[in-house]
C-alpha cells in the first residue's frame, strides 16, 4: 500500500540556474497541513510544477530531482492550458461560486474544457503509478472531477479520498454553475469526501440530491490543523528573537493589530480597514496608542478581480493614514508582499491582536498559527463567524465581518480586555490548536477510509 497525495501544485517552485534547476519550498494551507505529517506518515506527492516552457530533457531532469530530493512526482502542464484552467475556470468561475460570490461570474465553455483537460492529464499520470491496494488522496477544487475520471480509466482496485479545503455553498448557489452536475458527480466517485465543517458536507449532499447524483461516498467533517511545534520552534531561533526585539522597539507604547492574508476578496480586508477606521472614530483616545500591520500576500494577480482588489486596498490605506495620521504617526501599514517564516512568526508573537475578517472562508489557518505563537503574550483573536476556523477556536472574539460596526466594537473589546480574560481565552484556543493538529487531521481522514493503513504508512 502507498499513499499518493494529489494537489494542483507541488509545494515547490522551480527556476533555471547555471547548474540546472533551483527548487524553493512554498507555503499555503495544504502545504502547512501536510508538512506537519511528513515525519509521521509515508506518502508521495503528485502535482503541477510547470508554468514555463520546458523541453523533454529538462522535464527528465526535474522528474529525477523531484523524486530524489522531495519524493514527489511532477505533472507538466502547457502554460496556456494551465492559465485557462487555473485562472479562467478555477479562480474566475469556480472559486467565487463555492464561496457564494456568484454575481459577477460568467461561465465559459473554453475555460471549463481546459479544466477537464487539466484533470485528464492528472488522471493519466496517476494511472501510470497507482496499484491495487493504494490510497489516492485528492485535494481541493482544482481537481473535483478527477475521482470519477480515475474510476473510469483505471482497472486497478484502489481507494480515493477527496478533501475540499474551501467552502461548499448551499445548493441554490451551486444551481448557478452550468457544470454543477459534472462537479458533484466527479467528487461522488470518491470513497471518502471530507470537508472542514458539517455545513459544507450537508450542502454537498443537498446539491447531489438536487441534481440526481447518487452519493455512495462516506461524507465527513474533519477540520484541518497545523503543526504548532514548528511555529514555536521558530520563535526560539536567533533570527526570530532579534526581529521580535526590533518590532517591539519600533512600536513601543502602542498596541499592535495584525492581519495576514492572501490578497483575495473573500478575506474581507477592506471591511477590516473600514472597521478599524470606525474604531478610531468612536475611540479617538486610542489614536496615539494603536498601529495596524496588514500583510497582503499577492495572489492570482492575473485575474482582474484580484488585481483591482489591491488597488482598492491601497486607496483605503492612504485614506486611513490621511484621515487619522500625522507626520509623526502612521496608523496603518500595508505590506503587499510575502514574508519569510521567521518574519511571520515574529509578527504573530509581538501582536496584541489578530484580525481574521473573512467574508467567507473554508478554514483560515492563519488564526491557528497566531494562537501557536502567543503563549507569552496571550493576544486576542478577532475571528469572522463565516470562517471555518470559528468551529475550531471557540474562545475567539467572533464578529460578523460584513458589519464594520461590529468589527470596530470587537477591536475595542479586545484592546480593553483584562489580562485574566485574555489568558483564559488563549488557553482554550491553545488546547484546541494542540489537539487538532495536522497529524490528527490526516489520521482521521485515513481512519475514515480504512482500518489497516497504519501497518503500511506509519513511519
UniProtKB/Swiss-Prot annotation:
It catalyses: D-glucose 6-phosphate + UDP-alpha-D-glucose = alpha,alpha-trehalose 6-phosphate + UDP + H(+). It is found in: Cytoplasm. UDP binds at residues 262, 267, 365-369. The keyword Heme does not apply. GO terms for molecular function: alpha,alpha-trehalose-phosphate synthase (UDP-forming) activity; trehalose-phosphatase activity. UDP-alpha-D-glucose binds at residues 262, 267, 361-369. Disulfide bonds: none annotated. It is an enzyme of class 2 (transferase). D-glucose 6-phosphate binds at residues 86, 140, 300. GO terms for cellular component: cytosol. Keywords: Cytoplasm, Glycosyltransferase, Stress response, Transferase. GO terms for biological process: trehalose biosynthetic process. Its EC number is 2.4.1.15. Belongs to the glycosyltransferase 20 family. Synthase catalytic subunit of the trehalose synthase complex that catalyzes the production of trehalose from glucose-6-phosphate and UDP-alpha-D-glucose in a two step process. Can function independently of the complex. Component of the trehalose synthase complex. This is Alpha,alpha-trehalose-phosphate synthase [UDP-forming]. It comes from Encephalitozoon cuniculi (strain GB-M1).
Amino acid at each position: 500500500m502507498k499513499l499518493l497525495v494529489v494537489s494542483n501544485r507541488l509545494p515547490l517552485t522551480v527556476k533555471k540556474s547555471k547548474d540546472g534547476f533551483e527548487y524553493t519550498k512554498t507555503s499555503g494551507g495544504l502545504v502547512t497541513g501536510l508538512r506537519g505529517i511528513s515525519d509521521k506518515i509515508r506518502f508521495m506527492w503528485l502535482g503541477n510544477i510547470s508554468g514555463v516552457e520546458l523541453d523533454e530533457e529538462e522535464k527528465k531532469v526535474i522528474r529525477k530531482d523531484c523524486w530524489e530530493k522531495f519524493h514527489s512526482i511532477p505533472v507538466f502542464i502547457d502554460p496556456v492550458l494551465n492559465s485557462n484552467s487555473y485562472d479562467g475556470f478555477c479562480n474566475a468561475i469556480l472559486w467565487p461560486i463555492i464561496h457564494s460570490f456568484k454575481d459577477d461570474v460568467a461561465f465559459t465553455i473554453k475555460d471549463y474544457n481546459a479544466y477537464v483537460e487539466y484533470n485528464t492529464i492528472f488522471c493519466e499520470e496517476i494511472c501510470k503509478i497507482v496499484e491495487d491496494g493504494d490510497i489516492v488522496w485528492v485535494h481541493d477544487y482544482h481537481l473535483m472531477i478527477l475521482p470519477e475520471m480515475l474510476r473510469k480509466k483505471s482497472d486497478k482496485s484502489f481507494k480515493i479520498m477527496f478533501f475540499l479545503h474551501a467552502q461548499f455553498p448551499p445548493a441554490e448557489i451551486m444551481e448557478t454553475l452550468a457544470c454543477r452536475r459534472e462537479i458533484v458527480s466527479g467528487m461522488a466517485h470518491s470513497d471518502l469526501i471530507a470537508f472542514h465543517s458539517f455545513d459544507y458536507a450537508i450542502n454537498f449532499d443537498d446539491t447531489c440530491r438536487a441534481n440526481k447524483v447518487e452519493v455512495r461516498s462516506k461524507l465527513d467533517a474533519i477540520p484541518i490543523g497545523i503543526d504548532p511545534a514548528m511555529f514555536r520552534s521558530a520563535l526560539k531561533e536567533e533570527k526570530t528573537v532579534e526581529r521580535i526585539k526590533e518590532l517591539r522597539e519600533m512600536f513601543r507604547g502602542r498596541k499592535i493589530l495584525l492581519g495576514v492574508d492572501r490578497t483575495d476578496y473573500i478575506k474581507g480586508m477592506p471591511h477590516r480597514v473600514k472597521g478599524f477606521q470606525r474604531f478610531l472614530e468612536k475611540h479617538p483616545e486610542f489614536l496615539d496608542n494603536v498601529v495596524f500591520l496588514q500583510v497582503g500576500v499577492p495572489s492570482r494577480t492575473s485575474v482582474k478581480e484580484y488585481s483591482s482588489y489591491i488597488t482598492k486596498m491601497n486607496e483605503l490605506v492612504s485614506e486611513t493614514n490621511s484621515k487619522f495620521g500625522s507626520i509623526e504617526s502612521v496608523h496603518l501599514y500595508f505590506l503587499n508582499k510575502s514574508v519569510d517564516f521567521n518574519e511571520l512568526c515574529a509578527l504573530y508573537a509581538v501582536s496584541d491582536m489578530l484580525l481574521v475578517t473573512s467574508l467567507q472562508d473554508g478554514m483560515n489557518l492563519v488564526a491557528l498559527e497566531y494562537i501557536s505563537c502567543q503563549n507569552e503574550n496571550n493576544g486576542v483573536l478577532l475571528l469572522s463567524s463565516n470562517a471555518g476556523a470559528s468551529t475550531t477556536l471557540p474562545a475567539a472574539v467572533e464578529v460578523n465581518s460584513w458589519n464594520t460596526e461590529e468589527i470596530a466594537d470587537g477591536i475595542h473589546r479586545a484592546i480593553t480586555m483584562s489580562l485574566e480574560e485574555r489568558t483564559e481565552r488563549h488557553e482554550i484556543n491553545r488546547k484546541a490548536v494542540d489537539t487538532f493538529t495536522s497529524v490528527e487531521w490526516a489520521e482521521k481522514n485515513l481512519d475514515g477510509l480504512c482500518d489497516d493503513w497504519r501497518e503500511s504508512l506509519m513511519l
